[in-house]
UniProtKB/Swiss-Prot annotation:
One of its GO terms (biological process) is translation. It comes from the Bacteria. Keywords: Ribonucleoprotein, Ribosomal protein, RNA-binding, rRNA-binding. GO terms for molecular function: small ribosomal subunit rRNA binding; structural constituent of ribosome. Belongs to the bacterial ribosomal protein bS20 family. The gene is rpsT. This is Small ribosomal subunit protein bS20. It comes from Coprothermobacter proteolyticus (strain ATCC 35245 / DSM 5265 / OCM 4 / BT).
Length: 88
């Protein structure tokens, strides 16, 4: 239990920030899953569109501070590696 007003305020803020971060993190994971599924389907055009959208969402999440920029770069790199292995 919080003993001060500022501690109570931080608890409220933490809940709000956690919900915000969870929303963007799950959105990012959803788009990455869609991209991986499109890559596995073998349709190059659909996979390319899905990968580009996933990269866009990953960049947005990094700009918002939900994930670190290096994590964003790593996720995009791994996604492109899968894409290139499948279609080259």
């Amino acid at each position: 239990m919080a003993n001060t007003i500022s501690a109570e305020r931080r608890i409220r803020l933490t809940k709000k920030e956690t919900a915000y971060n969870r929303y963007w993190r799950t959105t990012m994971k959803t788009y990455v899953k869609r991209a991986k599924k499109a890559i596995e389907s073998g349709d190059r055009e659909a996979a390319e569109a899905a990968v580009l959208k996933a990269q866009s969402v990953i960049d947005k999440v990094a700009v918002k501070g939900v994930i670190h920029k290096n994590e964003a770069a790593r996720r995009k790199s791994r996604l492109m590696k899968l894409f290139n292995q499948k279609f080259q």
